[in-house]
Amino acid sequence: MNFDTLKKFDEEIYEVIQKETKRQRGSIELIASENFVTTAVMEAMGSQLTNKYAEGYPDKRYYGGCEEVDVAENLARNRLKKLFNAEHANVQPHSGANANIGVYFATLEPGDTVLGMNLSHGGHLTHGSPVNISGAYYNFVAYGVDSVTHRIDYEEVMRVAQEAKPKMIVAGASAYPRAIDFKKFREIADAVGAYLMVDMAHIAGLVAVGLHQNPCEYADFVTTTTHKTLRGPRGGAILCKEKYAKIIDKAIFPGLQGGPLMHVIAAKAVAFKEALEPGFKAYQEQVIKNAKALGEELKKQGFDLVSDGTDTHLLLIDLRNKNITGKDAERLFDEVGITVNKNTIPFDPQSPFVTSGIRIGTPAVTTRGMKEEEMKKIAGVMNIIIDHPEKVSEAQKVVDELCNQFKLYE
């Protein structure tokens, strides 16, 4: 993209953009929630649509002059519905968190009981963490994973649900590497008369191409981010049954937000169109192949994987046998240009600020064109960093070679 005007007016911000672009080009991005959007998505985000206020919804705006942005929002809504075979879509949430809070606001009263996945077992802040508005406003009861298999025990979820009698059950995770059985969650919700909400933010791209069970078949409400595996701009969306359309739309506007970000909604529409293209399935298939290949090679190098592997795009690594914390590992990897994030593991003895694990994923490296052979090299680099720090120059060389071979935004 051309930043000539910005360079002349605000050299400081121009420098930030240039340095961040250089960082992205010169590092291996393994944070599971990050990806690289296309130039088309960025062009839509940087368009004149950023100038338009459009409170309300298409054909029901509180401002004049919304004819063109109505077209953009309808394109985004219709493409998203087609992508997930959903009855209704709201593309206005500014984030996945706003999408989640919007569903709660539409369906719950303060103090209502909700079942959500324990944050330290792979859930998300907005699934009832006491430091989040979800945990402060609602009575969240947590379910987790089995202490041995580190997988969701659906019989235990049923037991907790029958005991807690929640008004809503939230399924979905931010650090759970295995496929989630939404049909079983529907059965549990029906058994206790609860709404079922699925947060598919991490796996939306996999769901879109049929590589993971589609929650829209089972859930009353499905929330998502539009980035991560979906590879769109940063934002959120809600899918629901048509009978809930009015309460969801009302909860987002005027309930939670004011004016929608029309430039971001246009960029969402572009990303959804990309996801409807045949090549998007091949991309997602490679994401999973890469995650599995990376996991297998890491196991060969002596790393412990939570649940012993992955069905998705992400891996959770237990570093306790390596005698290093997630916090320290994140720093060491960052020094050679491998970006990961420290992450709690199930039943973690460390604090969330230190952690015993790291979370990694393959969406971004797959976007760059890397495949299974490159995953083996990356695993080798990770092993050097943790077990053979005296060979750090070798690791740096491999990182540089991979980044030079697989170009980004050039």
Swiss-Prot record:
The residues forming a coiled coil are none
**GO biological process assignments:** glycine biosynthetic process from serine; tetrahydrofolate interconversion
Which UniProt keywords are present, listed alphabetically?
Amino-acid biosynthesis, Cytoplasm, One-carbon metabolism, Pyridoxal phosphate, Transferase
Tell me any Pfam family this protein matches. SHMT
Q: What is its main location?
A: cytoplasm
Indicate where the modification N6-(pyridoxal phosphate)lysine is found in the sequence.
228
Q: What is its EC number?
A: 2.1.2.1
What reaction does this enzyme carry out catalytically? Answer: (6R)-5,10-methylene-5,6,7,8-tetrahydrofolate + glycine + H2O = (6S)-5,6,7,8-tetrahydrofolate + L-serine
Q: Where does (6S)-5,6,7,8-tetrahydrofolate bind?
A: 119, 123-125, 351-353
- For the protein in the UniProt heading, the enzyme class is transferase
What cofactor is needed? pyridoxal 5'-phosphate
Marked site positions, Plays an important role in substrate specificity: 227
Q: Which domain of life is it from?
A: Bacteria
Pathway(s) of this molecule: One-carbon metabolism; tetrahydrofolate interconversion; Amino-acid biosynthesis; glycine biosynthesis; glycine from L-serine: step 1/1
- Say yes or no: keyword Endoplasmic reticulum present: no
Functional summary from the UniProt entry: Catalyzes the reversible interconversion of serine and glycine with tetrahydrofolate (THF) serving as the one-carbon carrier. This reaction serves as the major source of one-carbon groups required for the biosynthesis of purines, thymidylate, methionine, and other important biomolecules. Also exhibits THF-independent aldolase activity toward beta-hydroxyamino acids, producing glycine and aldehydes, via a retro-aldol mechanism.
Q: State the similarity comment.
A: Belongs to the SHMT family.
Q: What is this protein called?
A: Serine hydroxymethyltransferase
Q: Which organism is it from?
A: Alkaliphilus metalliredigens (strain QYMF)
